[in-house]
Amino acid sequence: MTFYLERGYIQQTFCGSHCLNFIYKGAINMIYVGIDVAKDKHDCFAMNSDGEILIEHMTIQNNFDGFNSLFNSISLFNESFDNIKVGLEATGHYSNNILNFLTSKGFNVYVINPLQTNLYRKGQSLRKTKTDKLDARFIATMLISDNLKPYSNLSYHISELKSLVRHRFRLVHERSKFKTSLSRLVTLVFPELEKIVWSISQNSVLYLLNELPSAKEISECNLTHLTSILEKYSKGKYSRDKAIEIRELARKSIGTNSRSLSFELKQVIQTVLFLQSQIDDIDKELKTLVNELNSPIMSIPGISYVSAAFILAEIGDVNNFDSPAKLQAFAGLDPSTYQSGKYTATHSVMVKRGSKYLRWALLNATRLVCMRDKTFNDYKNSKLAERKHYFVALSHTTKKLIRVIYYLLKTNTSYQLQKVA
């Protein structure tokens, strides 16, 4: 179906089984544009507040020309972009580019959870029909009926945080795999070492094994040079005495002197160090972004920049949650419930649905908060005194932390014991 966007032209559109003719006369109260986002192309639909269809179906390519075509089409509808609402689904990285393009042009863009769109579509029709064309139309209709909030500067910061924290999560996961390989290789080439150092993953040990990747090489190393390596990378914690202890142990080691194992060990160590440097760089960026947000949750003792970044990135706008219980459910920290007839289970497990990143961040943050704040530590100990398992007690304490975080974000106030304990 062709359509004309020039002012004064008669425009014919198709709506279900009805054909609607109207004259586009310029200024219209509100324009609603729905975009169904895909990898290579996007389907668009537009209507005004009177229900008149301006674009029945328009497909644009996911490229510069496609974006400009959409911009030119929408711009003709109304001189003021304040009267134009554009909606699209949050489809991960597929929606990022068109979202940034539209916001840079000054449009009010509304990012909608795909679950909301799905529920809305089911509520509008009993037919099991789902097409990109229909989805674009449903999104436009939701802009009229739903109380949605436009993408904002806060949304931008949250989006940036989310991208970085998830990248960090993946890198930490990769580093963990290589640390497992490191442990295996050290067990083969110098198994006695891990008994006399705090961790084989600490910098002093990594740099030592990177230069001397076998017990044989360590046993033959000059004591002065060995001491120099340990002192430099342990920042003075290891001295000549530790160097002597390590060298003597290396001379009695049962470890395998293998060229291939030593080579693999060096490469694994270099990968661990590289991943660590990347994680450190991400942490610097996270600190900058968290400082720009100036969030009150940083006032909670034990909440680090990294923890705050994960929590803020996953929560997004706290006003999307009606209560702390809703936020708890989003984190997947709800207890499961099983009931059948007269039977109700007395023991339940954590649901573990929702954001795994938020759940991980909250549980880790709770451990640190308990170390720094007496109120939280006492609460955890009270649960332990009830003979609850440590992780059950930690889960209860995490729920308390969620209530505190919710209160601080809702009221934009700093943490004060007498108010939130």
Describe the predicted segments one by one:
Residues 1-421:
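A detector of single, family-specific signature residues
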